[in-house]
């Protein structure tokens, strides 16, 4: 039996989310059908609002409602340090620990030759531009401890070091293959404190 078109379209939409297959999408679709109308409307409005009201900061690439973002506008931040992360969710994770007071730069991905992702496909050019424009003394590379994250860190290090800027990498507490997003605040704090030059 085929599902009615509205259900089929909803299932298809859910399947566009990462990690959501046919079964989970179907379950979510039927859960959505069972929702109160006001909850379904609020859910739909939240989806539309995220796409309409959020954009990427023109300086650091983080998600924001205003441009530049709140962090880039904050005059109390240490402008001599930029912490480079893969995704905006990593900025959120780092901010939870409330210890790091420098700036950020979001790459929106990592180098991955297997997937055809090269330097021009992620937010590297604007990072290099920032290093020439700003008074940056240190770049902390906080890519995930995966093969692609390590390759991206090494690539960035080779690009940045000739400019005389110290390049460090997060250290203690983050195991190989782990994502920053899932680390707790104490682990992240130890990783920032124990960073090493690369």
From Swiss-Prot:
Q: Which PROSITE patterns match?
A: RECR, TOPRIM
Q: Which family is this protein grouped under?
A: Belongs to the RecR family.
One molecular function GO term is: zinc ion binding
What Pfam families does the entry give?
A: RecR_C, RecR_HhH, RecR_ZnF, Toprim_4
As for what it does, the entry says: May play a role in DNA repair. It seems to be involved in an RecBC-independent recombinational process of DNA repair. It may act with RecF and RecO.
Which keywords are on file for this protein? DNA damage, DNA recombination, DNA repair, Metal-binding, Zinc, Zinc-finger
Q: What is this protein called?
A: Recombination protein RecR
Q: Which gene encodes it?
A: recR
The Gene Ontology biological process annotation of the record reads: DNA recombination; DNA repair
Instruction: Write down the species.
Output: Enterococcus faecalis (strain ATCC 700802 / V583)
All copies of the Toprim domain together span 80-175
Zinc finger region(s), C4-type: 57-72
What InterPro entries would the database entry show?
A: DNA_Rcmb_RecR, Rcmb_RecR, Rcmb_RecR_Znf, TOPRIM_dom, TOPRIM_RecR
Annotated SMART domains: TOPRIM
CDD domains annotated for this entry?
Answer: TOPRIM_recR (cd01025)
Keyword Magnesium carried by entry = no
């Amino acid at each position: 039996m085929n599902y009615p078109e509205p259900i089929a379209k909803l299932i298809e939409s859910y399947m566009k989310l990462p990690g959501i297959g046919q079964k989970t999408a179907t379950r979510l679709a039927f859960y959505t059908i069972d929702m109160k109308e006001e909850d379904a409307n609020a859910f739909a409005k939240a989806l539309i609002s995220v796409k309409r009201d959020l954009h990427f900061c023109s300086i650091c690439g983080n998600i924001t409602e205003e441009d530049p973002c709140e962090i880039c506008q904050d005059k109390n931040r240490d402008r001599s340090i930029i912490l480079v992360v893969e995704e905006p969710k990593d900025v959120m994770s780092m901010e939870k620990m409330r210890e790091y007071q420098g700036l950020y730069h979001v790459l929106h991905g990592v180098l991955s030759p297997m997937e055809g992702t090269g330097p021009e496909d992620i937010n590297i050019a604007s990072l290099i531009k920032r290093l020439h424009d700003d008074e940056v003394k240190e770049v902390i590379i906080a890519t995930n401890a995966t093969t692609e994250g390590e390759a991206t860190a090494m690539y960035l290090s080779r690009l940045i070091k000739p400019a005389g800027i110290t390049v460090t990498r997060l250290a203690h507490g983050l195991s190989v293959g782990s994502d920053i997003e899932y680390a707790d605040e104490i682990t992240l704090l130890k990783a920032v404190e124990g960073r090493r030059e690369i």
